[in-house]
């Protein structure tokens, strides 16, 4: 199997849903920094797609959202300039403007995060994320904003439990797992173009390390177990979040968790 294979899971006239393996970057990195830590050319998502799927030449591809190098899972790639602009508008302005895009992740934690509501909304400066604890070590997260390392920072600073194998934010190494893979996966994407809305579940990429890391919650094909799939499809916070916990750390006004 090609180490940097980027399978197209779903096709729509305005976009593709692809499954990113760990190690691939969604935008070209600074090469001087890259070669300090790597002895190979940076595997850039769109470059790999063009090489692996040459029959789609002539389309204008854009990644309208990005995943960090060690994060796996679904990425929506627009197929034309208008779609890219409409998805970007939705991400910037929210609501029903542009083409609305829903992004849900699952995160593996080393231990249970105690003392927090089972579900709620995290506001940390300008970073907003909805969450629900599915198991002691498994959290579902839906981005309301998309800042750099948003989920990784919030798991470490709010939950007090970094994502598994995420040493950048204080996570412990996992024996037998490569360094550039963490327990954070883009597992659900919802996209609405005009009146047409579609949702997609994204399996764990078929690599030995990823399957080992997520073994507890996936089947032999990499799909999540039914209980996790149901939560990914159905997740929604209550319309009124009447209670608030304020944490003193985090700066920029601190951290708030709103919950019912």
Swiss-Prot record:
Active site, per annotation: 68
Biological role: Pseudouridylate synthase responsible for the pseudouridine-2819 formation in mitochondrial 21S rRNA. May modulate the efficiency or the fidelity of the mitochondrial translation machinery.
Keyword set, alphabetical order: Isomerase, Mitochondrion, rRNA processing
EC number: 5.4.99.43
Gene3D superfamilies: Pseudouridine synthase
CDD domains (alphabetical): PseudoU_synth_RluA_like
GO cellular component: mitochondrion
GO biological process: enzyme-directed rRNA pseudouridine synthesis
InterPro entries: PsdUridine_synth_cat_dom_sf (IPR020103), PsdUridine_synth_RluA-like_CS (IPR006224), PsdUridine_synth_RsuA/RluA (IPR006145), RluA_PseudoU_synthase (IPR050188)
Family stated for the protein in its record: Belongs to the pseudouridine synthase RluA family.
Entry's localization field: Mitochondrion
Reaction catalysed by this enzyme: uridine(2819) in 21S rRNA = pseudouridine(2819) in 21S rRNA
Protein name: 21S rRNA pseudouridine(2819) synthase
GO molecular function: 21S rRNA pseudouridine(2819) synthase activity; pseudouridine synthase activity; pseudouridylate synthase activity; RNA binding
PANTHER family: 21S RRNA PSEUDOURIDINE(2819) SYNTHASE, MITOCHONDRIAL RNA PSEUDOURIDINE SYNTHASE
Pfam families (alphabetical): PseudoU_synth_2
Top EC class for this record: isomerase
Primary site of residence: mitochondrion
């Amino acid at each position: 199997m090609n180490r940097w294979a980027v399978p197209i899971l779903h096709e729509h006239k305005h976009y593709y849903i692809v499954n990113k393996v760990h190690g691939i970057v969604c935008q070209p990195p600074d090469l001087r920094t890259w070669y300090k830590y790597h002895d190979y050319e940076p595997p850039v998502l769109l470059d790999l797609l063009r090489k692996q799927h040459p029959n789609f030449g002539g389309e204008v591809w854009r990644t309208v959202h990005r995943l960090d190098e060690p994060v796996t899972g679904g990425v929506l790639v627009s197929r034309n300039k208008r779609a890219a602009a409409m998805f970007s508008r939705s991400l910037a302005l929210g609501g029903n403007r542009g083409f609305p895009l829903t992004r849900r992740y699952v995160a593996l934690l080393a231990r249970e995060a105690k003392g927090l509501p089972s579900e709620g909304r995290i506001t940390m400066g300008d970073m907003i994320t909805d969450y629900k604890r599915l198991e002691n070590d498994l959290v579902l997260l839906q981005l309301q904003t998309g800042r750099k390392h948003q989920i990784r920072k919030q798991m470490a600073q709010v939950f007090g439990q970094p994502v598994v194998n995420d040493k950048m934010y204080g996570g412990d190494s996992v024996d037998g797992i490569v360094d550039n893979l963490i327990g954070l996966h883009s597992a659900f994407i919802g996209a609405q173009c005009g009146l047409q809305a579609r949702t997609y579940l994204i399996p764990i990429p078929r690599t030995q390390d990823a399957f080992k890391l997520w073994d507890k919650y996936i089947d032999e094909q990499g799909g999540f177990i039914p209980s996790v799939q149901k939560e990914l499809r159905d997740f929604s916070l209550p319309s009124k979040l009447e209670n608030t916990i304020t944490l003193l750390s985090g700066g920029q006004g601190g951290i708030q968790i709103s919950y019912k």
